[in-house]
Amino acid sequence: MSSSLADSINSLNSVALGEKKSDLVLTNCNLLSVYTREIIPKTQIAIINDRIAYVGPDATHTIGAKTKVIDIHNKFVSPGFADTHLHIDQFVLPSEFAKQSLLCGVTSLFLSLIHI
């Protein structure tokens, strides 16, 4: 494992355990659980270095003096979606397709490039 990846994992674990403080905490989230198909209200999300370190009912252990806390007022959050079967043909640039997919919450694409 590269040292930067190891450092990132250690940082995420430290925040999740409350040993290190997060950069950002989102409060009052309605979390869409893709496992149980339910909406989990009042979820809190702690973020460090643009990565999610903690998701749960109470992220106060991750909040420090420099942590920015944003109340998102019961808006919905969900994990990034993966599109596991698609084809891009010669009429669509892959970079443009990726941009449009992100707007729909798709963060992972598994595709077959056809005639590009």
What name fits each language-model region?
Residues 55, 111-112:
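Generic beta-strand/beta-sheet core signal
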Residues 4-24, 31-78:
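Histidine-rich, glycine-flanked metal-binding segment
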